[in-house]
């Protein structure tokens, strides 16, 4: 699995990961522009940093995601964080629903 690694200067602890949400669709299939107020929260993002995993019964459990993975996550999971002008989401590994295969 993974060790602690990062593409940003944020080091998540335990079983947390830092994700950069992918932008929501700007237009509909018919070409209508979607205003920011009507956009759904994104549920897909790129993993930028991975914590070392949590301890259970004295053993550290590695995470199933790696830096660079594109993941689907719970719509209202995690904490939104702004750092150096960028927006990130800090999620527990439990909030990750799936890894998107390329």
UniProtKB/Swiss-Prot annotation:
Intracellular or extracellular location(s): Cytoplasm
Cited function: Together with the chaperonin GroEL, plays an essential role in assisting protein folding. The GroEL-GroES system forms a nano-cage that allows encapsulation of the non-native substrate proteins and provides a physical environment optimized to promote and accelerate protein folding. GroES binds to the apical surface of the GroEL ring, thereby capping the opening of the GroEL channel.
Record-linked SUPFAM superfamilies: GroES-like
Organism annotation: Streptomyces coelicolor (strain ATCC BAA-471 / A3(2) / M145)
Entry keywords, A to Z: Chaperone, Cytoplasm
Family recorded in the similarity comment: Belongs to the GroES chaperonin family.
Subunit structure, as described in the record: Heptamer of 7 subunits arranged in a ring. Interacts with the chaperonin GroEL.
Name of the protein in question: Co-chaperonin GroES
Recorded GO MF terms: ATP binding; metal ion binding; protein folding chaperone; protein-folding chaperone binding; unfolded protein binding
GO BP annotations, alphabetical order: chaperone cofactor-dependent protein refolding
Pfam family, one: Cpn10
UniProt xrefs under PANTHER family: 10 KDA HEAT SHOCK PROTEIN, CO-CHAPERONIN GROES
InterPro entries named among the record's database cross-references: Chaperonin_GroES (IPR020818), Chaperonin_GroES_sf (IPR037124), Chaprnonin_Cpn10_CS (IPR018369), GroES-like_sf (IPR011032)
Recorded name of the encoding gene: groES
Gene Ontology cellular-component terms listed: cytoplasm
């Amino acid at each position: 699995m993974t060790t602690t690694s990062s593409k940003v200067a944020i080091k998540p602890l335990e079983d947390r990961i830092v994700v950069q949400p992918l932008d929501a669709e700007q237009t509909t299939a018919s070409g209508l522009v979607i205003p920011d107020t009507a956009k759904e929260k994104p549920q897909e993002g790129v993993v930028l940093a991975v914590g070392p995993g949590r301890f259970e019964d004295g053993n550290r459990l590695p995470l199933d995601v790696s830096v660079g993975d594109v993941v689907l996550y719970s719509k209202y999971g995690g904490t939104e964080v702004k750092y150096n002008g960028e927006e990130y989401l800090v999620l527990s590994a439990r909030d990750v629903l799936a890894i998107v295969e390329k």
